[in-house]
Amino acid sequence: MTNIRKSHPLMKIVNNAFIDLPAPSNISSWWNFGSLLGVCLILQILTGLFLAMHYTSDTTTAFSSVAHICRDVNYGWIIRYMHANGASMFFICLYMHVGRGLYYGSYTFLETWNIGVTLLLTVMATAFMGYVLPWGQMSFWGATVITNLLSAIPYIGTNLVEWIWGGFSVDKATLTRFFAFHFILPFIITAIAMVHLLFLHETGSNNPTGISSDADKIPFHPYYTIKDILGALLLILALMLLVLFTPDLLGDPDNYTPANPLNTPPHIKPEWYFLFAYAILRSIPNKLGGVLALAFSILILALIPLLHTSKQRSMIFRPLSQCLFWTLVADLLTLTWIGGQPVEHPYIIIGQLASIMYFLLILVLMPTAGTIENKLLKW
């Protein structure tokens, strides 16, 4: 008799995706981040669900309801901090996952890569709307500043911003709709992630060498299930260390002050995971130019497959490209640091140079390096 996992219509899908899936024998820990993102997503949905049971999306009570969750709800504080710091973990895993894709040339799986870019944008939108919900000072002013950027769009800009706000400023209508979207989007993300996985399983995983691994496959279970469980345990350990010892390390102190439209905080800045994009936005003195640079800084990922010039897929045997890749990582860390600094000398010029470097590396230097490496290898 055939095993139930191979014959049952539902179990068959699970079996082909997580049990009998043929996987390359040499994929490293950099391939763990996909499953870690799944763990993060489930964690965020569960903690978010319990927070939504006690949260009220009204401007007069939102801040108090979050304080109530932390003070009066059983284990409310741990649920709240797991959700807030879980978002940071989510983005650490996301950036590592994207970085892995860039380094090992995983972007040549076009459908998988483009759905991944869509996922990144959706997660960023979800995180932004979630940051507005506690209705602290940074929540309010962050929402005001970021939504206001859309007013740079010619002709329809102002109407678009007022349509998103649901009025003439960020107010009750804005908070209510942001809560509604923040609640629904994770489920949409789950659906898109399933499509992401579907397309990945059409081609099979890439591996560190970037060459076909058809000659040497191993079953996903038990090898990679064990590996993924270890990764998940380490992720949860890191998260719980953050939650239990320094829960406010990555937050902004201004968010412990209730939102006040009459008092602007001295330094308006987003959460740490958006600082690199914020630095690029601020480095251009023109509003529309800044908005376009901000959008392009993320959308540039969709162009990566078109910019691949090397005859080799992975960077593992390409020292020139490796140098440029790690320069890009250093550049992104520099931008993240600059995004959190005030707009004054020398931070302005550092931010502008780092922004130019970011686009130069991706659009010019890395494709050039690929061509040079081909020439050096007489290909």
From Swiss-Prot:
Keywords: Electron transport, Heme, Iron, Membrane, Metal-binding, Mitochondrion, Mitochondrion inner membrane, Respiratory chain, Transmembrane, Transmembrane helix, Transport, Ubiquinone. Signal peptide: none annotated. Binds 2 heme b groups non-covalently. Gene3D superfamilies: Cytochrome Bc1 Complex, Chain C (1.20.810.10). CDD domains: cytochrome_b_C (cd00290), Cytochrome_b_N (cd00284). GO terms for biological process: mitochondrial electron transport, ubiquinol to cytochrome c. Its cofactor is heme b. It holds the Pfam family Cytochrome_B. A ubiquinone binds at residue 201. Heme b b566 binds at residues 97, 196. It is found in: Mitochondrion inner membrane. The chain crosses the membrane at residues 33-53, 77-98, 113-133, 178-198, 226-246, 288-308, 320-340, 347-367. It is a multi-pass membrane protein. Heme b b562 binds at residues 83, 182. Its main location: mitochondrion. One of its GO terms (cellular component) is respiratory chain complex III. InterPro entries: Cyt_b/b6_C (IPR005798), Cyt_b/b6_C_sf (IPR036150), Cyt_b/b6_N (IPR005797), Cytb/b6-like_sf (IPR027387), Cytochrome_b (IPR030689), Cytochrome_b_C_euk/bac (IPR048260), Cytochrome_b_N_euk/bac (IPR048259), Di-haem_cyt_TM (IPR016174). Heme 1 (or BL or b562) is low-potential and absorbs at about 562 nm, and heme 2 (or BH or b566) is high-potential and absorbs at about 566 nm. The cytochrome bc1 complex contains 11 subunits: 3 respiratory subunits (MT-CYB, CYC1 and UQCRFS1), 2 core proteins (UQCRC1 and UQCRC2) and 6 low-molecular weight proteins (UQCRH/QCR6, UQCRB/QCR7, UQCRQ/QCR8, UQCR10/QCR9, UQCR11/QCR10 and a cleavage product of UQCRFS1). This cytochrome bc1 complex then forms a dimer. Component of the ubiquinol-cytochrome c reductase complex (complex III or cytochrome b-c1 complex) that is part of the mitochondrial respiratory chain. The b-c1 complex mediates electron transfer from ubiquinol to cytochrome c. Contributes to the generation of a proton gradient across the mitochondrial membrane that is then used for ATP synthesis. This is Cytochrome b.
